From Swiss-Prot:
Family: Belongs to the UPF0060 family.
Full protein name: UPF0060 membrane protein AAur_4166
UniProt-annotated location(s): Cell membrane
Major subcellular location class: membrane
Keyword NAD: no
Domain of life: Bacteria
Cellular component GO terms held in the UniProt record: plasma membrane
Length: 112
């Protein structure tokens, strides 16, 4: 259950953070209406709550692991929303990051 909960929270965090940043990018760089940026700010605020719901008690561990999810998620978002096509090095780098997420979050620890 912990792995499932952690995974769901990381995915929700990625959608909120990457989506929020993308909305702001659209307003500032792509000429969309400024209310897109406002929605982006709201999404980024929502993102901030997801880490607090992670089962692990250590902020540094959760945010460090989430960084790997953010990297892979950003590439995926770019593919879905902007037509970005990652090269093999992007994919290899993202895969390494996801392995790192697993090590950080789920490695056996003393007393755990």
């Amino acid at each position: 259950m912990t792995i499932l909960k952690t995974t769901i929270l990381f995915v929700l965090a990625a959608v909120a953070e990457i989506g929020g940043a993308w909305l702001i990018w659209q307003a500032v760089r792509e000429g969309k209406a400024w209310w897109w940026a406002g929605l982006g700010v709201v999404a980024l605020g929502i993102y901030g709550f997801f880490a607090a719901f992670q089962p692990d008690a250590h902020f540094g561990r959760v945010l460090a692991a989430y960084g790997g999810v953010f990297i892979a998620g950003s590439l995926g978002w770019g593919m879905l929303m902007d037509g970005f096509r990652p090269d093999r090095w992007d994919v290899i780098g993202a895969a390494i990051c996801i392995v790192g997420v697993g090590v950080i979050m789920f490695a056996p620890r003393p007393g755990g």
